[in-house]
Amino acid sequence: MTILSIVIPAYNEEDGITEIATRVLAVTPDLKKAGVDEMELLVVDDGSRDKTAEVASKINGVTLVRHPKNKGYGAALKTGFAQAKGELIGFLDADGTYPPEYFPKLCRSALNGAELVIGSRMAGEKSEMPLVRRIGNFFFATLLTILGRQKVTDSASGMRVFKREILEHIYPLPDGLNLTPVMSTRALHEGIKIEEVPIPYSERVGRSKLSAIRDGRIFLQSMMWTAMSYNPVRILGLIGLASMGIAGLVSLWLIYLRANGVTTLDSASVAALFLGMISTVAGINVFALGITFNYLVALFYKKPIKQGLFGKPIFKTPLDQQFGWMGITGILAGLILG
């Protein structure tokens, strides 16, 4: 028997909790058509100072879980995950921005092999998302696509369905609003099968709790550090290549000047030469640091390196087994150039 547990984290949502809970409960017949035998709805009151808990407790079909004090969006979701009894777990916000009517579509994908199904607000359906947040979500989705080497259109969607078994692979997760982008980042790097289903997005009920600047910074920091813990060379390697690219451009410019008969460098050319030298040294060192960190990550997790800068790692055998020929190559290169 397939059970779907839907978790709604709620903080000061007395005006909207009844409507969203009622809409979730109303999709039960469609869930059964999609292959879900039973659905449970958990509302996690995250220390609300209004009547959210009181209102939710009076809704038939709702299991209320309470935090004595506010712990954060992510903490409320994790409490719900721990209380859920279903092998499928879904969640959405309490503010009415996400359409629970799309849960059957998400569940079909999950029952057909996907391990994490994300309702994408950026994949074509009608969206009332503010322009600033739309730009931010596009940026984070593009960043995650680069870091995880898989196309992602919405890295921070708050409507998802996933199989319970993936929790052990994507934990730990943060307590704040950055839970969703970190979940996406971990899932990509853990090789979890992800699918996206286009969903509409509505204007929220009440005032938004999301700050574009503050939470955007937290999202970026969380995603970068999470990716670094799996594949450091993906980030450091790109930085190193960019630095060496700058050095290459400077070199081409100096070669161009020399080809045109310039034999004396002015102050700007000297500064460019210095920039090129610094960029070369910095690029090589940062790139090498990324490779070293990847090796340390593999040692820490006691697993072989699965990823590299452009996908699969360059060295399938441990890096220390490559030091001999790498050293000889370096010596020969030095003798030739010298």
Each model region followed by its residue ranges:
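Hydrophobic helical membrane-anchoring modules
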Residues: 1, 178-338
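Cell-envelope/extracellular polymer assembly enzymes that use nucleotide-activated donors
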Residues: 3-5, 40, 182
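Donor nucleotide-sugar binding loop of glycosyltransferases
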Residues: 13-16, 48, 99
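Short beta-strand/loop segment that forms part of the nucleotide-sugar
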Residues: 21, 32-47, 65-66
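Acceptor/aglycone-binding surface of glycosyltransferases and processive sugar-polymer synthases
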Residues: 65-83, 88-91, 97-177, 181, ...
